[in-house]
């Protein structure tokens, strides 16, 4: 049975989608059959793996709201061992429609159930908010990874995030665990780094990955070409960093 991992931080601009795309691509590259589930209405994970959103026939919205089979919505990408359940702006309306569903917190878990056995890893890109879609993702997940930028304001909301995880564990998914914290957009020139890392260690003891993802122009460029960083610029520092992070993740499994 595959493992489902949500990449989640309710604070935007922390490299969440970049991490989803890069991590999923690295897993596939290392021989793990991987499904990337785009649950962010912006659909950047979808376009980030080369899928034209205007050509999507069925999306995560249709799977959640219109009872479309997840197998009919999944698209196999051109990248090794990597498929995607795409998203588009229709998903923005799903919060309101899910609110009327008596199983509103478990809709995604139910939708993914037919394919959980088909993949080694299912990686979910959550929206940067604590709404119903994010709660669905956490309910459907075995673990979550929190991408975090090493800056003062990045620490805001960590206690709220922990509270959300506790609520999900208590009411919807008792098996949910924190997989780890990944520092992104890391700049070795900033003196604040160590202070933030110490604070994170207080919140999440022994959960921070040793690998840190550097700030890079290449990471910003890759999505516009529909290519994960390990294919767009495979010898770049962020490419090596995401591969190293993936190795670190896999060693703990």
Regions found by a protein language model. Name each.
Residues 1-253:
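P-loop NTP-binding core
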């Amino acid at each position: 049975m595959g493992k489902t991992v949500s990449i989640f931080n309710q604070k935007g601009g922390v490299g969440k989608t970049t991490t989803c795309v890069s991590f999923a691509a690295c897993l596939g590259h290392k021989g793990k059959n991987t499904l990337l589930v785009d649950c962010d209405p912006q659909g950047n994970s979808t376009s980030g793996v080369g899928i034209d959103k205007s050509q999507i026939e069925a999306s995560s919205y249709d799977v959640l709201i219109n009872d479309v089979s997840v197998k009919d919505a999944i698209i196999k990408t051109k990248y090794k061992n990597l498929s995607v359940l795409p998203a588009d702006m229709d998903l923005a309306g799903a919060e309101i429609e899910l609110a009327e569903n008596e199983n509103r917190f478990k809709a995604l878990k139910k939708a993914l159930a037919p394919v959980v056995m088909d993949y080694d890893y299912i990686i979910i890109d959550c929206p940067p908010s604590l709404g119903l879609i994010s709660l669905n993702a956490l309910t459907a997940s075995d673990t979550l990874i929190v991408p975090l930028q090493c800056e003062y304001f990045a620490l805001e909301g960590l206690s709220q995030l922990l509270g959300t995880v506790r609520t999900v564990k208590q009411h919807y998914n008792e098996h949910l665990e924190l997989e780890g914290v990944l520092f992104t957009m890391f700049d070795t020139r900033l003196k604040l780094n160590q202070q933030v890392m110490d604070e994170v260690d207080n919140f999440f003891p022994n959960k921070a990955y040793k690998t840190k993802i550097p700030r890079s122009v290449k990471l910003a460029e890759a999505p516009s070409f529909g290519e994960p960083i390990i294919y767009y610029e495979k010898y770049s520092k962020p490419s090596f960093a995401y591969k190293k992070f993936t190795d670190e993740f896999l060693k703990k499994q």
